[in-house]
């Protein structure tokens, strides 16, 4: 997700996306352990997207 897309989301949508990405991250890590990962860079991308979403959520909660 791009920063502009994230800023347009509501608080509830941000929370749902964080939960979904955390599940995806768990699955990527599990695949990595079993050597079934197709694209290892997705782990880093997912972590960065979660961080962006959390930052946006924090800003919306403080506003």
UniProtKB/Swiss-Prot annotation:
Gene Ontology MF term list: structural constituent of ribosome
TM region positions: none
GO biological process: one example: translation
Keyword set, alphabetical order: Ribonucleoprotein, Ribosomal protein
Signal sequence segment: none
Domain of life: Bacteria
Annotated GO CC locations: ribonucleoprotein complex; ribosome
Family indicated by similarity: Belongs to the universal ribosomal protein uL29 family.
UniProt cross-references to HAMAP family, sorted A to Z: Ribosomal_uL29
Name of the protein this chain belongs to: Large ribosomal subunit protein uL29
Species for this entry: Pelagibacter ubique (strain HTCC1062)
């Amino acid at each position: 997700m791009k920063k502009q897309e994230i800023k347009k989301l509501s608080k509830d949508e941000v929370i749902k996306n964080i939960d979904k990405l955390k599940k995806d991250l768990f699955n990527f890590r599990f695949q990595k352990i079993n050597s079934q990962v197709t694209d290892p860079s997705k782990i880093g991308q997912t972590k960065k997207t979660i961080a962006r979403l959390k930052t946006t959520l924090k800003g919306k909660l403080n506003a």
